[in-house]
Amino acid sequence: MKVLLLEDVAKLGKKGEIKEVSDGYARNYLIPKNLAAEATGGYIKHIEESKKIEDKKKENLRKRSEEILEKLKGTKIEIKAKAGEKGKLFGAVTAQDISEKIEELLDEKFDRTWFDEKVNIKELGTHTLKVKLPQGVRGEIKVEIKPEN
């Protein structure tokens, strides 16, 4: 029996794949637990169309992420913060602060969770941060922390 997997199933396949399984396995385990549905002709066409639409959305999101990264590479991100005489900040510059500054500069949404590592900058100067945008687009941005006057 051909089934369409509705969830990832260990040792069988990933969500959205069509697999050939025994009738008993499908009727007694996969279908009752909503892990799969019987793959009929119309249902398969519907799923394939949905998958094409989803793939287009993912591709558009990947392109958008690459555009944002290119804009960031050409943009000087400068944040002012209160600092002591030796260059230590009073407090820290966080991912949220940098995200807000990027949104202000680019007029684009930039989520603080897109930073690869935890951001907690406590010194003046230029810092290189790794970012991971949606669809696996990775890159680095430079942020310059300057003292407030």
UniProtKB/Swiss-Prot annotation:
SUPFAM superfamilies: L9 N-domain-like (SSF55658), Ribosomal protein L9 C-domain (SSF55653). GO terms for biological process: translation. One of its GO terms (cellular component) is ribonucleoprotein complex. Signal peptide: none annotated. Belongs to the bacterial ribosomal protein bL9 family. Binds to the 23S rRNA. NCBIfam families: L9. This is Large ribosomal subunit protein bL9. It comes from Petrotoga mobilis (strain DSM 10674 / SJ95). The gene is rplI.
